[in-house]
Amino acid sequence: MNIGIVNDLPLAVEALRRVLALRTDHRVLWVATDGDEAVDFCVAHPPDLVLMDLVMPKVDGVAATRRIMARAPCAILVVTASVSANTSSVYEAMGAGALDAVDTPTLALGLSTDASPQALLAKIDQIGRLLESRTAALVPPGPAPERGQPTLVAIGASAGGPTALTALLRALPADFPAAIVIVQHVDQAFALGMAEWLDGYTRLPVRVARQGSVPQPGEVLLAATNDHLYLSPRGVLGYTRHPVETPYRPSIDVFFNSVADGWQGEAFGVLLTGMGRDGALGLKAMRAKGCYTIAQDEATSAVYGMPKAAAAIGAASAILPLERIAPQLISRITRPLRD
């Protein structure tokens, strides 16, 4: 994998070089010391992956991510001194299109820490699988579902998701009558913080989904672990390790398919910005079961991958700009219409 490094600290750059040198399949393509240089390098010498620091002179990592995704889109992994100390900026960068975040490796530390070489390499491998994979797994159907379940809005998002989710959720009223469950591609270390972050931007309560949680009208639940979130036929949320071989955990396809297979109440599917194809087949399964489904359009997507895949296979009842998705949900849920 050809990798670009964006970091103004020589010691951090050297640490990244040494970690990447542990793998013969990784090569440092270039090093930029600020966001402006990073944008220019991405245009002139497109990498497979950018390792993006957050705090830099001139143009910081959030602004650089936004500019790169606009001019020369590529996979971006935030690598910064302390993810936990920069959570707001991490979510901003992910909202602009970054795929994940990890602490800058410190070679003197043990191998089990979040700042270890292995932690960085694991994130790079995960992104590599996402870039290469074009498959999605389905959840087998369960027994007969329970009746009387409320209206459900199932949302999937990846790169660019935090910003898109913020815009969508803040446009919903406090008395929104449906339950909302979100699967966002994010490491479990950031899930609780992201739920709290989203909660600050919406009139609806946002919390992480626990094993055994039940979706309730007017409440937003966010997938919270690196296992796959699914809905049982009785309308209870759970987590599963299977399927094991998926490029991203949690999988949007797994969740959407569980909704299609077992949710008895009315359901809506929404697939937002993201890289790859996760969610496209699950959205199609939901539409095949009579659910109204929406894919975000290209113009408003930070990364037009997942919604593009959904559009290509006819999975979306409607392809809408981000600002029209919430009004469409409000209209359809208060005045139900058939696809």
UniProtKB/Swiss-Prot annotation:
The modification 4-aspartylphosphate is found at residue 53. It catalyses: [protein]-L-glutamate 5-O-methyl ester + H2O = L-glutamyl-[protein] + methanol + H(+); L-glutaminyl-[protein] + H2O = L-glutamyl-[protein] + NH4(+). It comes from the Bacteria. It is an enzyme of class 3 (hydrolase). Residues 2-119 form the Response regulatory domain. GO terms for cellular component: cytoplasm. This is Protein-glutamate methylesterase/protein-glutamine glutaminase 2. It is found in: Cytoplasm. The active site is at residues 158, 185, 278. InterPro entries: CheB-like, CheB_C, CheY-like_superfamily, Sig_transdc_resp-reg_Me-estase, Sig_transdc_resp-reg_receiver. Keywords: Chemotaxis, Cytoplasm, Hydrolase, Phosphoprotein. Phosphorylated by CheA. Phosphorylation of the N-terminal regulatory domain activates the methylesterase activity. Contains a C-terminal catalytic domain, and an N-terminal region which modulates catalytic activity. Belongs to the CheB family. The gene is cheB2. Residues 141-336 form the CheB-type methylesterase domain. It holds the Pfam family CheB_methylest. The keyword Cytoplasm applies. Its EC number is 3.1.1.61, 3.5.1.44.
